[in-house]
């Protein structure tokens, strides 16, 4: 086998074929050996010189594939280094090989894969050579198409591939300038390409040629100027001749979808007529040759084969694309009304198909339609509404806040919504019956048909629910009466059992919950009362735990969505809360969780109603809740109890009187405090009590209960924290010494034992409680005077002296919060924190990138906050420790954990800015001399490593800052050693030389001209982030390709920021429409 690795002699093709056969068909040791030899063969830099022999003389198609792969590698990486005659030789060889395979009918039929692979290699050459070195390629290709049907068919495939490579996949493989250049070259050749396609479609008889031509045309349609399409009769050909044949129907529909998406002028009547005509023809062909508009597509799809299912998906894409672009064209002509409604009727039928991706396609269109109809209603003149009409509407004004308008009133205006009345009514039903589960619902039916607690949230389902919800909200605004009637009648059929099923009651309840905020208050009151009464009746009526659990989850979801109604109807709110307390004793999995979640959700929106004394009540309801808390929470798990306490904390925070608030807090914490005081007393007398696992669980639970209440009460929690603070820190110390004793007795393995893990839970919860309070505290003087010193004494020395496995990352998190809130008030405290945790933590994480992941993240958060709030602390570090600090920052750059990487880059950026602010002082000068180039080289190291793409924006900012320091003359000392360069060399010149050397050593395949041109662009653009980032991005493409083009510098935009801005604008828009934001998303 090794014979093929001898590159000094001619290649033994037969031996190569044998090795390839062994690799593909053999097994065991021989197969492994063949794989190793083939890998070495392909990796040899001279392998490409053997490719032509393999392609000419090999009898094994797999060997030919390997030869083409070797050529691909050469073309993408080293093409520009080859002499011109070599390049032309390879080019002509590949073209000749493709043509000879096409001219042999037998080969053309049997070796399709090999011909395709050769086509791809040709396209790789084209990306390098065309148009500048091969300007006549497209005319030659078109000229050769008349030589034979096979050549013509393959030319279509090459054109398709070229379009895909240039237009669809160019983002990361080519620089921006190159991609733009190829696109411009392509657009000059449009006419010839289009003429060829048109000629074949008009005259061609070979079915496979027609399909290849349509596939090629498909790739070009979306950027061929529309006049080519509209000045010929190609639309007529597509929408009649090729729609009838089953072979071409699917690809033709895709082509028509592309045409539907073109931007056409609005003022050209001839083009408008053609646009309507091709749509009319297409629907007519579908109705007569494929399926009538009345067909039950849900059933058809379920029994169809793969091709027919794909066709229905393509039909949905065609209809939604065409109608989204050209709906207004059809709406404006009364004679096209039937066509318009038939198209939408097809879409209704397609929407009923049980296939999520297809449903999402139609749903996007429905969103487009109903939002459009809604905004037309919004533009109705408010002045038209006389006071009498306003009363009849059941809402105060036309503004969205007051709920949906009366449909009777809207009939007075010539609105587009009237055209779609029947379609919208059908759509309401489709959406209601296909509603997916909202994220608040925790009780679900699994694949086995059992009712269980749901643990995994699917982001796809959450997004789909959001879209469905928005469509249903618009539909409710368009006809609130129809929506209400459909929902109430479907609910009646749940009660009478005629439509009862878990799926049906769920989707209906989820739909009912999703339209909260769309109705006027009066309508909503009538509607919600009916719904909740019916659902409560169902819980009584239905037997069996599963049935009860399903209905309970639906009641809880619905009531959680209507806080406005609950706020206005105290008796109902009280009934609902008592029902939730009842569900808290229901042990079916998921029900108790959901009861607690719904309780806290309602409390967040209605908290004020619990702290005031309601009419006909003897006390505020929170007092009743606290008095019965033991009974209510008796069957709950600890985590659920914490949620309950957290909800009570939210209510108590709403009490305005400080004395009353403190009394309620004291009452709420009475049970946990009694247990706490008892345990503190007992464990002081008998410390071994803390080794009992039950006691440890109780203590951890008590502290977790405090954390829950503190989370919701924030600064108002101070009296309770004062009650337990000193004993808690004593406990922290006692537990720490116990852990140390266990480690001393049993070695490091002790940290993994249940006993020590239980003790560490106590420590972690204590830290969490203190951190939670300090993060929300307003009384910063008290925090400094009362809390900080005992905390640092209890925590820091223990952390430093512990074995690494017993150190808690929560210490770092807690210290981060202390520095964030009061670091500026305790300079010595910050220095103590740094001295205690910096070196010992760095020593835990500097051996690799994975051990102690939580410590890593928290460590860099702490350094970042100290850098921001208490920078002076770093200046107190001795030089050796400061060097470790810089090393730690550069170490963070190299992490794959995004938090660590981005924090590291931010620390570096803040540090450089802090040093700059110090001005021309010895410390700053020393810093620049010692560390400036470390930061430059380490930033370039991660910038050019594709594993660190996610840090690109921050890397660019840091590099910009470093370059600006030099080019704006902010550094007043030479950055080089005297012997390195001639005296008097400026920092600018030295930086350019340094970067040029560094980059040419790292990327020897780049020419000095490329590097000089990159650096020249970079050092001119350091004031404009967008341009600067574009230059860096282009450089990153260039380093992957040998012999790139030195003129390749343009810029690229950042998508992430655009997305954030889009989300912000969408939220602003949604806030103006009743019901578009969920109740939980609204500000109180």
From Swiss-Prot:
- Cited SMART domains: CRM1_C, IBN_N
A Pfam family annotated for this UniProt entry: CRM1_repeat_3
Annotated Gene Ontology cellular components are: cytoplasm; kinetochore; nucleus; perinuclear region of cytoplasm; spindle pole body
Instruction: Give the GO molecular function terms.
Output: nuclear export signal receptor activity; nuclear import signal receptor activity; small GTPase binding; U1 snRNA binding; U2 snRNA binding; U4 snRNA binding; U5 snRNA binding; U6 snRNA binding
Query: Taking every annotated instance into account, which residue ranges of this chain make up the domain Importin N-terminal?
Result: 34-100
**Which InterPro entries has this protein been placed in?**
ARM-like, ARM-type_fold, CRM1_repeat, Exp1_repeat_2, Exportin-1/Importin-b-like, Importin-beta_N, XPO1/5, XPO1_C_dom
Q: Which residues carry this modification: Phosphoserine?
A: 1080
Instruction: Please give the Gene3D superfamilies that the UniProt record associates with this protein.
Output: Leucine-rich Repeat Variant
**Any Gene Ontology biological process:** mRNA export from nucleus
- What main location does UniProt list? nucleus
Compartment list: Nucleus; Cytoplasm, Perinuclear region
Keywords carried by this UniProt record: Cytoplasm, Nucleus, Phosphoprotein, Protein transport, Transport
User: Misc remark for this entry?
Assistant: Present with 7080 molecules/cell in log phase SD medium.
The protein's assembly and partners: Interacts with GSP1/GSP2, polyadenylate-binding protein PAB1 and PRP40.
Family membership, please give it: Belongs to the exportin family.
Q: Report the function annotation for this chain.
A: Receptor for the leucine-rich nuclear export signal (NES).
Protein name as catalogued: Exportin-1
Q: What is the lineage of its organism?
A: Eukaryota, Fungi, Dikarya, Ascomycota, Saccharomycotina
Q: Gene for this protein? A: CRM1
């Amino acid at each position: 086998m090794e014979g093929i690795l001898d590159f000094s002699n001619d290649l033994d093709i037969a031996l190569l074929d044998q090795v390839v056969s062994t690799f593909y068909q053999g097994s065991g040791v021989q197969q492994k050996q063949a794989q190793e030899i083939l890998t070495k063969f392909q990796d040899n830099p001279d392998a490409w010189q053997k490719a032509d022999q393999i392609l000419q003389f090999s009898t094994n198609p797999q060997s030919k594939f390997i030869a083409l792969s070797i050529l691909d590698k050469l073309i993408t990486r080293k093409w520009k280094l080859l002499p011109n005659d070599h390049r032309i030789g390879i080019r002509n060889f590949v073209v000749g090989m493709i043509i000879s395979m096409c001219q042999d009918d037998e080969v053309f039929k049997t070796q399709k894969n090999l011909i395709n692979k050769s086509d791809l290699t040709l396209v790789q050459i084209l990306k390098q050579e065309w148009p500048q070195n091969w300007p006549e390629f497209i005319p030659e290709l078109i000229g050769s198409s008349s030589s034979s049907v096979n050549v013509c068919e393959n030319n279509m495939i090459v054109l398709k591939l070229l379009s895909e490579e240039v237009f669809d996949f160019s983002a990361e493989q080519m620089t921006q300038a190159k991609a733009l250049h190829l696109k411009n070259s392509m657009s000059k050749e449009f006419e010839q390409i289009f003429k060829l396609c048109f000629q074949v479609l008009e005259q061609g008889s070979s079915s496979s040629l027609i399909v290849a031509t349509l596939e090629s045309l498909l790739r070009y349609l979306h950027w061929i100027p529309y006049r080519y399409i509209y000045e010929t009769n190609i639309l007529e050909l597509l929408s009649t001749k090729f729609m009838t044949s089953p072979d071409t129907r699917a690809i033709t529909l895709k082509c028509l979808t592309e045409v539907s998406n073109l931007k056409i002028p609005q003022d050209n009547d001839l083009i408008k007529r053609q646009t309507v005509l091709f749509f009319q023809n297409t629907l007519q062909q579908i109705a007569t040759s494929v399926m009538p508009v009345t067909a039950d597509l849900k059933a058809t799809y379920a029994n169809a084969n793969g091709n027919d299912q794909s066709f229905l998906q393509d039909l949905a894409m065609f209809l939604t694309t065409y109608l989204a672009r050209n709906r207004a064209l059809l709406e404006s002509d009364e004679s096209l009304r039937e066509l318009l409604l038939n198209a939408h009727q097809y879409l209704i039928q397609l929407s009923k198909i049980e296939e999520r991706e297809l449903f999402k396609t139609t749903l996007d269109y429905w969103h487009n339609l109903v939002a459009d109809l809604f905004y037309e209603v919004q533009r109705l003149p408010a002045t038209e509404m006389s006071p009498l009409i306003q009363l009849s509407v059941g809402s105060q004004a036309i503004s969205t806040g007051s709920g949906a308008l009366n449909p009777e009133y809207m009939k007075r205006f010539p609105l587009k919504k009237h055209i779609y009345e029947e379609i919208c009514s059908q759509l309401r039903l489709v959406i209601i019956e296909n509603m997916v589960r909202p994220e608040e619902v925790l009780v679900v039916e699994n694949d086995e048909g059992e009712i269980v607690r749901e643990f995994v949230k699917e982001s796809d389902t959450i997004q789909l629910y959001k879209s469905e919800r928005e469509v249903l909200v618009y539909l409710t605004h368009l006809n609130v009466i129809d929506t209400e009637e459909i929902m109430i009648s479907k609910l009646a059929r749940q009660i009478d059992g005629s439509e009862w099923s878990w799926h049906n009651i769920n989707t209906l309840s989820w739909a009912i919950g999703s339209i909260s905020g769309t109705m006027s208050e009066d309508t909503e009151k009538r509607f919600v009362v009916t719904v909740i009464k019916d659902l409560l009746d169902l819980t009584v009526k239905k037997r069996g735990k599963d049935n009860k659990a399903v209905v309970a989850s639906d009641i809880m979801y619905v009531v959680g969505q209507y806080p406005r109604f609950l706020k206005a109807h105290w008796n109902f709110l009280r009934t609902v809360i008592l029902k939730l307390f009842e569900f808290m004793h229901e042990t079916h999995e998921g029900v108790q969780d959901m009861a607690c979640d719904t309780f806290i959700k309602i409390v967040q929106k209605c908290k004020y109603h619990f702290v005031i004394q309601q009419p006909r009540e003897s006390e505020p309801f929170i007092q009743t809740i606290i008095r019965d808390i033991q009974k209510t929470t008796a069957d709950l798990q600890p985590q659920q109890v914490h949620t309950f306490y957290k909800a009570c904390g939210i209510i108590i925070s709403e009490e305005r009187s400080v004395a009353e608030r403190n009394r309620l807090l004291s009452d709420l914490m009475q049970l946990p405090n009694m247990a706490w005081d008892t345990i503190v007393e007992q464990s002081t007398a008998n410390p071994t009590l803390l080794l009992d696992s039950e006691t440890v669980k109780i203590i951890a639970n008590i502290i977790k209960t405090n954390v829950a209440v503190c989370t919701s009460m924030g600064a108002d929690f101070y009296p309770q924290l004062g009650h337990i603070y000193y004993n808690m820190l004593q406990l922290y110390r006692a537990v720490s010494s116990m852990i140390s004793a266990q480690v001393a007795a049993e070695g490091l393995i002790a940290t993994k034992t249940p006993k020590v893990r239980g003790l560490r839970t106590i420590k972690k919860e204590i830290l969490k409680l203190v951190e939670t309070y300090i993060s929300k505290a307003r009384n910063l003087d008290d925090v400094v005077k009362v809390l900080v010193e005992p905390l640092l004494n209890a925590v820091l020395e223990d952390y430093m002296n512990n074995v690494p496995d017993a150190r808690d990352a929560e210490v770092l998190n807690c210290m981060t919060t202390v520095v964030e809130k009061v670091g500026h008030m305790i300079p010595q405290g910050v220095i103590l924190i740094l001295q205690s945790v910096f070196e010992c933590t760095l020593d835990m994480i500097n051996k690799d990138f994975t051990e102690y992941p939580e410590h890593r993240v928290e460590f860099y958060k702490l350094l970042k906050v100290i850098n921001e709030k208490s920078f002076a602390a770093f200046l107190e570090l001795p030089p050796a420790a400061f060097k470790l600090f810089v090393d730690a920052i550069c170490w963070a750059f190299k992490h794959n954990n995004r938090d660590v990487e981005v924090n590291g880059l931010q620390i570096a950026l803040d540090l450089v800015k802090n040093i700059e602010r110090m001005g021309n002082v010895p410390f700053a000068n020393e810093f620049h001399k010692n560390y400036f180039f470390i930061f430059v080289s380490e930033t370039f190291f991660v910038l050019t490593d594709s594993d660190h793409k996610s840090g690109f924006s921050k890397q660019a900012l840091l590099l910009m800052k470093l370059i600006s320091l030099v080019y704006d003359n902010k550094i007043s000392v030479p950055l080089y050693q005297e012997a390195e360069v001639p005296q008097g060399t400026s920092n600018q010149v030295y930086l350019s030389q340094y970067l040029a050397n560094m980059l040419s050593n790292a990327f020897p395949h780049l020419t000095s001209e490329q590097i000089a041109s990159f650096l020249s662009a970079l050092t001119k653009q350091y004031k404009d982030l967008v341009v600067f980032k574009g230059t860096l991005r282009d450089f990153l493409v260039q380093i992957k390709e040998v012999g790139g083009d030195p003129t390749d510098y343009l810029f690229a935009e950042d998508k992430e920021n655009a997305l954030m801005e889009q989300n912000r604008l969408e939220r602003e828009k949604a806030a103006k429409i009743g019901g578009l934001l969920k109740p939980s998303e609204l500000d109180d």
